[in-house]
A protein has these predicted regions:
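Residue-level signature of catalytic and energy-coupling elements of molecular machines
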Residues: 26, 46, 76, 93, ...
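P-loop NTP-binding catalytic core
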Residues: 102, 114-184
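Phosphate-interacting basic helix/loop segments used at nucleotide- and nucleic-acid interfaces
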Residues: 59-63, 165-169, 255-257, 309
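P-loop NTPase catalytic core
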Residues: 190-191, 199-438
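N-terminal "pre-motor" subdomain/linker immediately upstream of P-loop NTPase catalytic cores
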Residues: 39, 45-138
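Glycine-rich phosphate-binding P-loop
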Residues: 175-196, 218
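Basic helix-extension-helix modules of the SAP/HeH family
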Residues: 1-58
Length: 438
């Protein structure tokens, strides 16, 4: 669906201001706009104050937010910051929602007015754009559940630089495509956060037009900052470990609805999630008890919503896709975490396993080549690559030494194409001399 040229004033969005400016630069902007008490504000509050001051200066108030919390009476609220409830939320009337057939998760842009004396929220005066498209055009979109899912058939090339060995190995062993539903199985301290950063940067290089989100559930605040600074092309949505489980659930559900609305208009959406385990733990605390309990204190009813989140990933026949790569935590010492992984095992069409033994020996990337694979990989890679890959898998021995030799050989090649040539050459020599390929 082509984007219409905007006719409203061009203000930088919250996401653009937050990503493109440091706190020092924002403070300078605040000084220029003659804001008061800006030194007491954190970065997010500072961005909102600057946006408000810029619009007030021009006599216009144009804001955007994600529709959430549609009430029984039909009205709703647009969330302006991090998909969470806040004081800068915007009220949208039931008539506007009905007229433009706006659904939960839609990004709505339009003219707003400041709250009056007895009001708490901004009020939306007119709807200009829905998901950055003409609001009238978006009314014609199909429903997500009516779209036909297919296996991924358009590859996401993760190999970008010679030194990025993690993504190079993924390209060889677990190729991914648009619409992939992948599980990254990770024990503690195996390098999952570094891997997610490398995957995110590789995706933004290969698929710059795709909408990339990173969802952090129950992670540390410093990891949020690290990812926001490391992956400029991604929108980082987070609910840190100090937030209540209800907040984890609300943020994850709203982001999923946002992704679905984009897929409905033909967009390619990618969500990197850390972690599905902590989301399942949050649901286990939030849902009413079913009276049944699995090992580790896990209520089986709590797994329905996390599985629905993960299961939403799909390649769409008519165009558009939703890719979800989620981490699952294992070997944490918690029986519940192991049970959650067991329930999710086999639900994806790609699994990448990280190995604690490799990480303890300081062998990085700590990828367990033998246990990692992609379903229907023949739709993503050429026949010659597939033949070489199967030849490699046949040689695999369940030992860290094999993986170490594999990584050493990979590091001696300029790129994966060169690596395949070296393998084929080694295979020919092996038939003559009997020496191992790796």
């Amino acid at each position: 669906m082509p984007e219409r040229e905007r006719t409203s004033p061009q203000y930088e969005s919250f996401h653009e201001l937050y990503k493109n400016y440091t706190t020092k630069e924002l403070t300078q902007k605040a000084k220029t706009l003659k804001l008061t008490n800006y030194s007491k504000l954190n970065k997010k509050e500072l961005v909102l104050a600057i946006m408000e001051a810029q619009m007030e200066k021009d006599g216009n108030y144009y804001m955007e937010g994600i529709l959430d919390d549609i009430q029984p009476d039909g009205y709703g609220f647009l969330r302006t910051v991090n998909y969470s409830k806040g004081e800068k939320d915007i009220y949208i009337s039931a008539s506007q929602i009905r007229r433009f057939e706006i659904k939960r998760g839609d990004k709505v842009t339009g003219k707003v007015r400041k709250p009056k004396d007895n009001e708490k929220y901004y009020g939306l005066l007119q709807v200009d754009f829905v998901n950055d498209h003409n609001a009238e055009e978006v009314k014609k979109r199909p429903h997500f559940q009516a779209l036909t899912p297919l296996y991924p058939d358009e590859r996401i090339k993760l190999e970008t630089e010679t030194q990025n060995y993690s993504t190079r190995i993924m390209d060889l062993v677990t190729p991914i495509g648009l619409g992939q539903r992948g599980l990254i199985v990770a024990p503690p301290k195996a390098g999952k956060t570094s891997l997610l950063k490398e995957i995110a940067n590789a995706i933004s290089t290969d698929k710059p037009d795709a909408k990339l989100f990173i969802l952090l559930v129950g992670e540390r605040p410093e990891e949020v900052t690290d990812l926001e600074r490391s992956v400029e092309a991604a929108e980082v949505v987070h609910s840190t470990f100090d937030e209540p489980p209800e907040h984890h659930v609300k943020v994850a559900e709203l982001l999923l609805e946002r992704a679905k609305r984009l897929v409905e208009i033909g967009e390619d959406v990618i969500i990197l999630m850390d972690s599905i385990t902590r989301l399942a733990r949050a649901y286990n605390l939030v849902i009413p008890p079913s009276g049944r309990t699995l090992s580790g204190g896990l209520d089986p009813a709590s797994l329905h919503k996390p599985k629905a989140f993960f299961g939403a990933a799909r390649n769409i026949e008519a165009g558009g896709s939703l890719t979800i790569l989620a981490t699952a935590l294992v070997d944490t010492g918690s029986r519940m975490d192991d049970m959650i992984y067991e329930e999710f095992k086999g639900t994806g069409n790609m699994e990448l396993h990280l190995d604690r033994k490799l990480s303890e020996r300081r062998i990085f990337p700590a990828i367990d080549i033998g246990r990692s694979s992609t379903r229907k990989e023949e739709l993503l890679i050429s026949k010659s690559e597939l033949d070489t890959l199967w030849q490699l898998r046949n040689l695999f021995t369940d030992s860290t030494d094999f993986t170490e030799r594999f990584i050493r050989k990979l590091k001696r090649s300029k790129n994966n194409e060169d690596f395949f040539k070296q393998l084929q050459k080694s295979a020919e020599e092996s038939t003559k001399t009997g020496r191992p390929i790796i």
